[in-house]
Amino acid sequence: MFDVVTIGSATLDVFIESDSANIVSVSSKDKRSDFMSFPYGSKVEIDDFSRNLGGGGINTAMNFAHLGLKTSTVVKLGADEISPVIYQKLVESNIDTSNIIKSKEGLTGFSIILVSFQGDRTVLAHRGVNSSIKEKDVDFENIKSKWIYVA
């Protein structure tokens, strides 16, 4: 019996910081919009990058596990090189992996998060197999839990 089972998405998030990004403001009569820009067709140096697990199902599972709760997660992983990275991190974080849905094709969710010099973020997201989780994919008989958290 688990304390909590999370259901949601799984992604690998890559955070990229570059002071080369320009913030461009465009105003119209009714509003102003800010855009992050880089010189078109150029190679842009980055100042730093990191990768972290992301997605609502993973983020909440990690937080519950850090609080000491017996945790499992229902997420869908693709048939790619990202899938084992996420799987191993869940194991290391003491999160049960028996409810993970392993796709035989498709890509795991992936995001590139561009961080401006002001700290604002622009996210380029590929949902991958997260967008194809179906009720029939989930083994509800295996989900014995006090709580279920749908992210």
Go through the PLM ranges and name each one.
Residues 76-78:
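Alpha-helical transmembrane segments within multi-pass membrane transporters and channels
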Residues 52-59, 82, 104-105, 130-135:
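Short secondary-structure boundary/capping elements
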Residues 98-103, 113-151:
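Conserved phosphate-binding/catalytic loop of the ribokinase/pfkB sugar-kinase fold
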Residues 1-72:
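Glycine-rich phosphate/adenosyl-contacting loop at the front of the ribokinase-like
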Residues 89-106:
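A glycine-rich helix N-cap at a beta->alpha junction
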